[in-house]
């Protein structure tokens, strides 16, 4: 048995907030009360000065397994997630082979059983991620796919997107879309703006995101499908999402910590480690993302954890792959750049990391209740620390936040009643 003592519990679903002790027996929380007695055989976790939250849920990660395990694999990705306070992670399908078939999905599902946390998987929307023919969504759902996404590539065929949405609504599964029209991306990973001009590039225009966001928002309105616009980066895209919500669309937008924390200027400091798709944009876009998190236009914080090797990121900017790791810094960036700034409360932040992503993916997770699974993170919101490359649990270290001082440190992560990470 484990008892968490003296912590400040915040659970957005039950609206419990205050000092409570939590008793865990086996896989489940068995008691939540003020001042539970301690027996000799109970392991005690002292959570003084810490917030006790439901374990975080990431709906957008890349564990690169199968096919690219020199970058990351399911085991190391799960280890990184546990260090970041995540107890459930949903992985994207752009592996090798892509997850458009039951055989590849079963490999991932079986390997995930040995991971430190819960690792779930989406299937692709189209076969081979080619944007031409839909996968057998029903068969993939039956085999364990929790949703569908061609993340990493846009789907340019509007009729195919509508058919996918209609099928997804029938099956009650969510779809997630990467919105970048390649005709408006001259060089990927850098905003079409002043920084690109300094580097003699044209970059990825904001319109690359907004035109596809507008199309898919309109299709979400007409189809009723559960739709996620991934890693939103543009102020204009946010206005489109807001309008679609007002028109009754079952649509959400996710924001990544990088898009609400830094701007295109970071490329001048960090080079390829700040290269992401869609790119970091202007300060007014960053502020708009923060405002949208505040007014709930954006309901989910997702990491888009995208590990790459040092050799890959050492290439010239145009040749280097896009993406940065994010699971181990997401909480700290949210605390530092959303809560400490006064834009979000801790409850608001935790909602976007727990119950909101759980609801979107139809998961019975994201809360702390007696008689239910003990997925819990304990973090010190006021502990300040420096991000160090050598402390990453991921195989990769492609992060622009190395060397930055951040608030909010995970102290303990508990998954399924077991301690899977402790800050030593």
Swiss-Prot record:
Looking at its record, which EC class is this enzyme?
hydrolase
Reaction(s) catalysed by this chain's protein: (S)-dihydroorotate + H2O = N-carbamoyl-L-aspartate + H(+)
List ligand-binding residues for Zn(2+) 1. Answer: 60, 62, 151, 304
The EC number(s) given in the record are: 3.5.2.3
- Keywords on this record? Hydrolase, Metal-binding, Pyrimidine biosynthesis, Zinc
Record's cofactor remark? Binds 2 Zn(2+) ions per subunit.
Hey, which pathway is this one from?
Answer: Pyrimidine metabolism; UMP biosynthesis via de novo pathway; (S)-dihydroorotate from bicarbonate: step 3/3
Of the GO CC terms on this record, one is: cytoplasm
Q: Which CDD domains match?
A: DHOase_IIa
InterPro entries hit by this protein: Amidohydro-rel, DHOase, DHOase/Allantoinase_Hydrolase, Dihydroorotase_CS, Metal-dep_hydrolase_composite, Metal_Hydrolase
Please list the residues that bind Zn(2+) 2.
151, 178, 231
> What would you give as a GO molecular function for this chain, any one?
allantoinase activity
Cofactor names: Zn(2+)
Keyword Zinc belongs to the record: yes
Which residues are recorded as binding substrate?
62-64, 94, 277, 308
Q: Which residues form the active site?
A: 304
GO-annotated biological processes: 'de novo' UMP biosynthetic process; purine nucleobase catabolic process
The answer to whether keyword Disulfide bond applies is no
Annotated family: Belongs to the metallo-dependent hydrolases superfamily. DHOase family. Class I DHOase subfamily.
- UniProt function note: Catalyzes the reversible cyclization of carbamoyl aspartate to dihydroorotate.
HAMAP family according to UniProt? PyrC_classI_B
Q: Protein name, please?
A: Dihydroorotase
